Amino acid sequence: MQKRGDGIMVGTKRVILLAGHNFISPGCNTNIDGKLITEFDLTTHLVAEIFKRERLIGIDLIIKARNDFGNLVNEVNSLNGDILISCHFNAYDRKAQGTEVLYAHTSSKGRKLASVAQDILTKHLGLPDRGIKPTKPEDRGGSILNKTKPVAILIEPFFLDNIKNKDYLEKSIEKVSNAIIEILEYVDKNEL
């Protein structure tokens, strides 16, 4: 088997799994049993769990989390990925529910991957389907989706601010983890 210029075997897809937010800007949150749980806490936990479990031959999985406001677009582009999955959780009014996936408005491959990811996430979570959402660079999540080289999606599996029970949260994270593994299996076996 031949290697690409970046040392990865030809035919292998490099997938970047990005934990959304950082220590400075931790994203949305919920309070469970007096403990504040942030979006960044959960996204870093989620990508680490997936990295431990993922063993697909055709996938070179890179996990990324940030601790500052450096230029994320340049950082992602320097990783020479084929696919970017940016992991987030939603928030609104502590009542909203559902799953949605964002993609760059000009990317037909991003739209296809978003549609596949949305179907898989809603199947695993059983939450209302809020659909896939095209984004422009100035929109929420738009910069990472529109200015990076890989085919990119941003997943919002559920509304974190609507979760009040630790057991439900743990089960939901497990379901999201299983869904992302299924998305990676799709990426491994299919072209976009």
Segments and roles (model prediction):
Residues 2-73:
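Active-site histidine-acidic residue metal-binding/catalytic motifs
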Residues 9, 73, 83, 105-159:
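Catalytic cores of processing enzymes, dominated by hydrolases/peptidases
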Residues 13-16, 27, 35, 84-93, ...:
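Active-site-adjacent mobile loop/cap segments within catalytic or ligand-binding domains
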Residues 22-39, 91-124:
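A short, glycine/acidic-enriched catalytic loop
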Residues 22-24, 67-70, 89-95, 107-109, ...:
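Solvent-exposed loop/turn segments at secondary-structure junctions
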Residues 37-45, 70, 107-112, 167-175:
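Soluble non-cytosolic domains of exported or imported proteins
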Residues 44-47, 51, 73, 99, ...:
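Extracytoplasmic/secreted envelope proteins and their assembly/folding machinery
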Residues 73-89:
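A short, hydrophobic beta-strand-centered structural micro-motif
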